Design a protein with these regions (language model features):
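A short Gly-Trp-Pro
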Residues: 1-4, 9-136
Length: 136
């Protein structure tokens, strides 16, 4: 799969991943003005246009990146696993995705709602999952 930022300065390539997750945490909502709708791309990601990529450490466990030219969000990356989460909007419109999971569901504001039936995880469930995966 291939995705691009608005100005095409950055191209991201990954293996075909066809599921979308939503994150309702406060950081993601602040970052994008609403929930983050992302494709979990694993660690096998190729990025062209690195010179235009602006990366910052947004928490003790993750980095966020955007295009320094147009501001498009490029990825959220977990530091412990090197797993990339890429906004679904970067990929071609003709790709078929399945909406699978919503995390931080207990942090979702009441002013929006998705109709899809998904797996839902609370903040506590997510932090428990991350804590157990770091102890492997």
């Amino acid at each position: 799969m291939e995705g691009k930022c608005l100005c095409s300065a950055i191209t991201i390539r990954t293996l075909d991943k066809k599921s979308i997750d939503a994150c309702h945490c406060g950081m993601c909502r602040r970052w994008g003005g609403g929930p983050a709708l992302v494709v979990s791309c694993g660690s096998e990601v190729q990025i062209e246009g690195i010179d235009k990529l602006k990366v910052y450490k947004s928490s003790e466990w993750a980095q966020r990146a955007f295009c320094s030219e147009c501001g498009t969000h490029i990825f959220y990356r977990l530091l412990s696993t090197n797993e990339y989460f890429v906004p679904v909007g970067l990929f071609q419109d003709d790709l078929e995705f399945e909406f699978k999971e919503q995390i931080f569901i207990d942090r979702k504001p009441s002013y929006y709602e998705f109709a899809n039936q998904t797996l839902n995880m609370t903040e506590a469930e997510i932090f428990t999952k991350f804590a157990s995966s770091e102890n492997i």
